[in-house]
Amino acid sequence: MTDPSGTEAPSKVGSFLIWQQPHLIYLAELLYRANPSEELLKKYNSLIQETAEFMYSFATYEEEHDRYVLKGAIPAQETLRAAETVNPPFELSYWHFAMQVAQTWRERTGLERVPEWDVLIEKLSPLAYNDEQLYLAAETAVDTYKDIRFTSDHMAVLGAVGILPMNQLIHAGYMKNTLHWIWDNWNWDKTWGWDYPMTAMNAARMGEPEKAVSALLMDKRTNTYLVNGHNYQDGRLRIYLPGNGGLLTTVAMMCAGWDGSEGNNPGFPKDGKWNVRWEGLQPLP
């Protein structure tokens, strides 16, 4: 995390976060999907390629296991420590998605795919899970479902399929197991405003639209919106915007769908109680 001049932000957490790195690739892809043009390709391709080059360089190859890992970072679930965290799930999924998109942009602009990037995509570590077939907060967080430190803050594992599409690193059944456990047991009083939209996005992609709606309407302090639109968290934060952006994105996804979704308004229950009207929205990847 940096300021506009590139100076590192003063934070004991922000300096170790990596999950924002692929944002530029994701946002540029959304722009292109909404309005494909040579102008967009020329405007953003160099930034996408440089971002992907950093992401490739950040991943570590483990010869013993013939795989790439992500480590030395604080994940989106900020209760984990950089020095001991390996393979956080949201970051793995985001790396996989963004590197694929970067290769696609190379093809769109007449460039050859980077072979080393394809190797990374193929050999990126799958998400780690326990004996109960629940995904862990990180490969190294073996006590994920026993230690409240790992069941508080952002349930970022749900973002691995929700904010992002399903991919080869993830087993759909294990992800649904994880959603159900989190729904019933998470420390919901220690969450943030964008956790509810993220949970809803996961539920929608997992074929549970009732949970998607219920997540958006969950009665928790950090899921509160004041009359001025502020997603109130606590008295310390005078403004907090991630929840607003998450809510808008999630509702749009529940309406317009995502690549591979079926039918109209796929994120809403088909119980005859919903009459959803919308216009001008685009499906997510």
Give each language-model segment a name.
Residues 265-285:
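Surface beta-strand/loop "capping" patches
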